[in-house]
């Protein structure tokens, strides 16, 4: 009995090793299941148990995401992610761009760039050790080899390389609703057709020549479903027309040049980041490479993607029709307000607050079709849209132009509404060169001591601004009543009815003044 026990105990025990599958193999299994093939046959083909196959299907979304976004080497067998996810994404993005531009990358370069990104992203405790670098290379299947030097004599256009090899990575990683482009443009917000000649071709590089200039920063997503709130940068931190104003439909900032600065851009991105965090979204925002657009630390929901400096700013989607549409609509409204004053024999007044309200109104009127077409013109993939709404804007404005001329408004000979809207397109919107810390500190100190433009300087002798008393609660309710009586004589949808009711309820809830 004892001998039998010893014999059994000494017999070799065979333990079947659990088979590990690569991500590519898991993708093949998922495709086979979804094509209708029997699960038993699939399990037998790949040498796995049925419960392992069920586990793969349960984690299908994770496997597909890892494969489609190229976050992992397809030969890898585990999907364990890193602690510094944002750092790894930035580093891989940089590595892919370097590959596309035929820039050889080695371990020391990657370590240097990893530490650089860590500082920019706020990971001050991170140090790129050999162990971390080896694990990173393993996760993404990176192998550094000597790059052969080939003198082909063929010049490569960096912009073509970027569009063909870099942009697709972003568009693969993000849904069109989460792909944004942001762009600045200058605006002479009081410029009428009667005084266009003085501004034609003006760059306003020092911010002193044009008293009525502002900078707009605007952005939309790729499918045209979302427009970011406008950012307006003026010269006066607290203009007289803003007195008593507690809220605006836009973001408003100011400095003495009415330019975008690194500080304003950083604050704006942080506000937008909070908004997208609340929506539990992850977005990419494309911006020009310039001193006013720095890397912004600690963004959790926004990835900033910088157009390479070799690309002209004209390639930005906003420059392909969105800005044009907004400005045509704005000039259209400005002329209408001017005509109303002329025909009623009243002095024309138009303040910065009027400009803010008009811009907000016109921004809401820019159509999704215009936005989608602009992205297509900029080289971004998008469903085809054939509506040329920018031209439609111009066509609508032709009748107004004829009306204006008939009322005695002088247009420059041959000046179209499109040319009128584009006269300020050359205005500079940011500092051309990077300032050092001492210069920025000095400028901030000067601004704090009152070097913002004063009301007197901005008003142009007061001819185009007027102080209006703040209406009472009773006045506001009376105005809502007048609006309701007017709208009842027109077809009104449920949404507008609801908006009117919400407006009246909001006013009623305010304390009487």
From Swiss-Prot:
Q: Where are the transmembrane segments?
A: none
Provide the protein name: Tigger transposable element-derived protein 4
Domain HTH psq-type intervals = 12-63
Its predominant location is nucleus
Which terms in the GO cellular component ontology are assigned? nucleus
Positions with biased composition (Basic and acidic residues): 433-448
Query: SUPFAM superfamilies under this entry?
Result: Homeodomain-like
Q: Which UniProt keywords apply?
A: DNA-binding, Nucleus
Q: Where is this region: Disordered?
A: 433-473
> Mind telling me which InterPro entries this protein's record contains?
CenT-Element_Derived, DDE_SF_endonuclease_dom, Homeodomain-like_sf, HTH_CenpB_DNA-bd_dom, HTH_Psq
GO MF annotation list: DNA binding
Q: What subcellular locations does the record give?
A: Nucleus
Highest taxon of source: Eukaryota
Residue ranges occupied by any HTH CENPB-type domain in the UniProt entry: 75-146
Q: Using the record's annotation, list all stretches that form the DDE-1 domain.
A: 174-375
Against PROSITE patterns, the record matches this protein to: HTH_CENPB, HTH_PSQ
Q: Which family does it belong to?
A: Belongs to the tigger transposable element derived protein family.
Ranges annotated as DNA-binding: 39-59, 108-139
